[in-house]
């Protein structure tokens, strides 16, 4: 029997299995266990949550393999880990460790300011960030099996995630209405392959799952992103930078499931303790923005 391990179809199918769920950033085995108990569909293993990366500065790299293995041993749900944009050797290391997904992430300090990783060269599926349809389709062309909005990680401010999700969804709606004879010009405008433009127009959505990420800190934030068309939610600093991580983690998982029921949302949002401190994105300089990394 022919086995199709590592094909685009298989990798996209693995990402589809996470649909409707919450993926949580964790920095140790204890946090990973809290995330799993709360109902997370996967965890993202990293050295520091985005809020700490933003506050401490310096160069942010792939997490220590020892830490990643400890997290993998602690939970039964899929484990993801981040690599720097363009750093294919970090990705090779993570694949050798046996992680379930690799996130080529703008949250870490880019290793290559010109090229992203050729993700087709790997058997493990990749997730990548995007601010608009062009970015999303370029990452998919490189082999990404999953897209997430970039938002502005580590701020606790959902405004950029909202902007990016609305932008992607608006562009898809416009593409669906575009006459076929204009698709080649649209592909040139977006810097994306024509076959992906045609597929997206036919589907009326991205060819891969599209999660929301970047600044999601409350159950209401998570529910909002689901209303805007997200297939699920990444939560970075919002859980473990809050006063009651265990309770907030569970509430955000429930919010993604019951995003269309304001009565349930009201109940699960009660008495969660202080959320993570937020940052006004408008006060960040261009050099402080993480979302501008990549192309």
UniProtKB/Swiss-Prot annotation:
Alphabetical list of Gene3D superfamilies matching this protein: Aldolase class I (3.20.20.70)
Binding-site residues for D-ribose 5-phosphate, renumbered to this chain: 25, 154, 215, 236-237
GO biological process: amino acid metabolic process; pyridoxal phosphate biosynthetic process; pyridoxine biosynthetic process
Record bears the keyword NADP: no
Reaction(s) catalysed by this chain's protein: aldehydo-D-ribose 5-phosphate + D-glyceraldehyde 3-phosphate + L-glutamine = pyridoxal 5'-phosphate + L-glutamate + phosphate + 3 H2O + H(+)
Keywords: Lyase, Pyridoxal phosphate, Schiff base
Single GO MF annotation: pyridoxal 5'-phosphate synthase (glutamine hydrolysing) activity
One Pfam family it belongs to: SOR_SNZ
Protein purpose: Catalyzes the formation of pyridoxal 5'-phosphate from ribose 5-phosphate (RBP), glyceraldehyde 3-phosphate (G3P) and ammonia. The ammonia is provided by the PdxT subunit. Can also use ribulose 5-phosphate and dihydroxyacetone phosphate as substrates, resulting from enzyme-catalyzed isomerization of RBP and G3P, respectively.
NCBIfam families noted in UniProt: PRK04180.1, pyridoxal 5'-phosphate synthase lyase subunit PdxS
Protein name in the entry: Pyridoxal 5'-phosphate synthase subunit PdxS
Organism: Dictyoglomus turgidum (strain DSM 6724 / Z-1310)
Gene behind this protein: pdxS
């Amino acid at each position: 029997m022919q086995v199709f391990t590592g094909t685009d179809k298989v990798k996209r199918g693995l990402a589809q299995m996470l649909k409707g769920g919450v993926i949580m950033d964790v920095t140790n085995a204890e946090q990973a266990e809290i995330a799993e108990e709360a109902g997370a569909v996967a965890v993202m293993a990293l050295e520091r949550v985005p809020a700490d990366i933003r506050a401490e500065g310096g160069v942010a790299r792939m997490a220590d393999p020892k830490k990643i293995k400890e997290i993998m041993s602690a939970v039964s749900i899929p484990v993801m880990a981040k690599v720097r944009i363009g750093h294919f050797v970090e990705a090779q290391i993570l694949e050798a460790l046996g992680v379930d997904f690799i996130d080529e992430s703008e949250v870490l300090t880019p290793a290559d300011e010109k090229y992203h990783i050729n993700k087709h060269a790997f058997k493990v599926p990749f997730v990548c960030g995007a601010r608009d349809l062009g970015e999303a389709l370029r990452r998919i062309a490189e082999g990404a099996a999953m897209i997430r909005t970039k938002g502005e990680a580590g701020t606790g401010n959902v405004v950029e995630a909202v902007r990016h999700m609305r932008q992607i969804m608006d562009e898809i709606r416009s593409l669906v209405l575009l006459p076929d004879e204009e698709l080649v010009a649209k592909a040139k405008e977006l810097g994306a392959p024509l076959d992906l433009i045609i597929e997206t127009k036919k589907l009326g959505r991205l060819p891969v799952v599209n999660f929301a990420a970047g600044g999601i800190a409350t159950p209401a934030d998570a529910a909002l992103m689901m209303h805007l068309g997200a297939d699920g939610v990444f939560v970075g600093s919002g859980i473990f930078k809050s006063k009651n991580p265990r309770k907030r983690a569970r509430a955000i998982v429930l919010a993604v499931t019951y995003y269309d029921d304001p009565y349930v949302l009201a109940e699960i949002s009660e008495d969660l303790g202080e959320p993570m401190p937020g940052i006004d994105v408008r006060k960040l300089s261009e050099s402080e923005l993480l979302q501008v990394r990549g192309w």
